[in-house]
């Protein structure tokens, strides 16, 4: 592999050290290596902000691992940044001097504002949804809050509170008592209060979380079959569960890994404070943050206004998809959706996911015609899809699995991006669009009227169409039968 196409970003965080190695190919990024080590550097800071020898040694040990991977990458294509703990540590110079010797490249201690800006860039390049956003990143010793529109930030704050420092300060007795949570939340709200007005002034349409705490919450919710949106009610529920566990070493929540458990209660307390102080309705997980911001900065790639479209185009190119046919199916599905939207009230994001499924429905053919829907579902489940959340990927895979043949109703109910009923409706529209676009020519798609009354669909074709299309009639009869097996009434006239 040509080493000039390789880039590395290293983030010396207060809780973990991370390394990301990517390959740049035709304007898109392919992840080659992700390494994360819990170093808990912030835990080595004493009251005088002196970093202990043990904490420094843990950090250097980790960097020796990273250094081996960096040898293959040109130095101008490596960025190493240090954040909150090394901003605070009075003896940071000692740590950084040795770190630079180990890595063989410069280590830059960045300001809180620069960290916030890079986090925002990482989110803007990798996360779909509305353009106007609030980004929250809870680190080990600092929390970044950024508002922005598109690629531009409108306000940037780096606050000195984090999941490691709050753990040491409010849960040092390892007690998960209500009082400890109350103290941690109150302290976090006090830190937030001076910046809350400016953040609210700039406003946001979506809120995105980019930290280990949010990642942990996402994993918990997926494991427990909840939808992926984080809400204050869910956070309070998890807090009560933690309090029931009593002690940090006994913390057990389905979906919470042992690795994340130690700093989970302190991160949770900070997040509850942020939700309460800023009146956040819901939050989803970002597709990337600081490291992605560093990589995209080195590549000088512009922020794509529509990340999901870029992702779909890259995948269509890679799997040699017939884009004319994909567009034909998408146009027909959209037409059907418009005809039933008054009855079914499908939200804009659900429409977008249906059209995404249309664009990708034939990728399974790149493996084999036999079992193409299975191949398509497998590929979508395992591909990196910037702009789509894990739950949205699961929905897309489920729709592609059920694009033809008998319907697997349980799979539509197991995804958690949309309610089961909506997943069923999207699946029905996708199947009909694929069926009627089957001859792969615009002029051979009949004029179809679709009406919905609750779950009953009535499909009306031009007068003599069925008589003149015996194969088409056979396919429609088969589809009606398959839909009837799962109690989806389809009346064809």
UniProtKB/Swiss-Prot annotation:
Keyword Hydrolase: yes
Biochemical pathway: Purine metabolism; ppGpp biosynthesis; ppGpp from GTP: step 2/2
GO-annotated biological processes: guanosine pentaphosphate catabolic process; guanosine tetraphosphate biosynthetic process; nucleobase-containing small molecule interconversion
EC class: hydrolase
GO function terms (MF aspect): guanosine-5'-triphosphate,3'-diphosphate diphosphatase activity
Keyword tRNA-binding on entry: no
SUPFAM superfamilies, per database record: Actin-like ATPase domain, HD-domain/PDEase-like
Chain segments annotated as transmembrane: none
NCBIfam families for this protein: PRK11031.1
Function recorded in the entry: Catalyzes the conversion of pppGpp to ppGpp. Guanosine pentaphosphate (pppGpp) is a cytoplasmic signaling molecule which together with ppGpp controls the 'stringent response', an adaptive process that allows bacteria to respond to amino acid starvation, resulting in the coordinated regulation of numerous cellular activities.
Protein name, per record: Guanosine-5'-triphosphate,3'-diphosphate pyrophosphatase
């Amino acid at each position: 592999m040509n080493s000039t196409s390789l880039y590395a970003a290293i983030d010396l965080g207060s809780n973990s050290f991370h390394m990301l190695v990517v390959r740049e190919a035709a304007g898109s990024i392919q992840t080659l290596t992700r390494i994360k080590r819990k170093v808990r550097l912030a835990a080595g800071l004493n009251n005088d902000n002196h970093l202990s020898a043990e904490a420094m040694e843990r950090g250097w040990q980790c960097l020796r691992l990273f250094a081996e991977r960096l040898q293959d990458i040109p130095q101008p294509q490596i960025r190493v940044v240090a954040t909150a703990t090394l901003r605070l540590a009075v003896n940071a110079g000692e740590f950084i001097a040795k770190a630079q010797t180990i890595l063989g490249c410069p280590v830059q201690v960045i300001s809180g504002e620069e960290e916030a800006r890079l986090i925002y860039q990482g989110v803007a390049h990798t996360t779909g949804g509305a353009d106007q956003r609030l980004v929250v990143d809870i680190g080990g010793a600092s929390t970044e809050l950024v508002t922005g529109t598109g690629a531009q930030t409108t306000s940037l704050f780096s606050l000195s509170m984090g999941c490691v420092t709050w753990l040491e300060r409010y849960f040092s007795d390892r007690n998960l008592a209500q009082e400890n949570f109350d103290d941690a939340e109150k302290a976090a709200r006090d830190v937030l209060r001076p910046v809350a007005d400016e953040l609210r002034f700039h406003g946001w349409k979506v809120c995105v979380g980019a930290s280990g705490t949010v990642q942990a919450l996402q994993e918990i919710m997926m494991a427990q079959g909840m939808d992926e949106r984080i809400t204050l009610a869910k956070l309070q529920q998890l807090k009560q569960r933690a309090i029931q566990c009593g002690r940090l070493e006994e913390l057990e929540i389905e979906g919470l890994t042992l690795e994340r458990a130690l700093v989970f209660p302190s991160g949770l307390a900070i997040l509850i404070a942020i939700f309460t102080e800023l009146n956040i309705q819901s939050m989803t997980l970002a597709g990337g943050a600081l490291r992605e911001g560093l990589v995209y900065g080195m590549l000088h790639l512009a922020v794509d206004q529509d990340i999901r479209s870029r992702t779909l185009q890259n995948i269509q190119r890679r799997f040699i998809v017939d884009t004319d046919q994909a567009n034909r199916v998408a146009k027909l599905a959209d037409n059907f959706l418009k005809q039933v939207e008054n009855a079914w009230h499908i939200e804009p994001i659900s429409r977008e996911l249906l059209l995404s499924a249309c664009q990708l429905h034939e990728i399974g053919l790149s493996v084999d015609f036999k079992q193409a829907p299975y191949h398509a579902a497998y590929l979508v489940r395992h591909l990196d899809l910037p702009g789509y959340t894990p739950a949205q990927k699961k929905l897309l895979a489920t729709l592609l699995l059920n694009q033809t043949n008998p319907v697997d109703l349980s799979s539509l109910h197991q995804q958690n991006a949309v309610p089961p009923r909506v997943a069923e409706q999207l699946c029905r529209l996708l199947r009909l669009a694929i069926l009627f676009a089957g001859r792969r020519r615009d002029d051979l798609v009949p004029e179809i009227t679709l009406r919905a009354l609750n779950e009953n669909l009535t499909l009306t074709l031009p007068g003599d169409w069925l008589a003149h299309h015996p194969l088409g009639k056979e396919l429609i009869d088969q589809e009606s039968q398959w839909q009837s097996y799962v109690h989806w009434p389809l009346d064809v006239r």
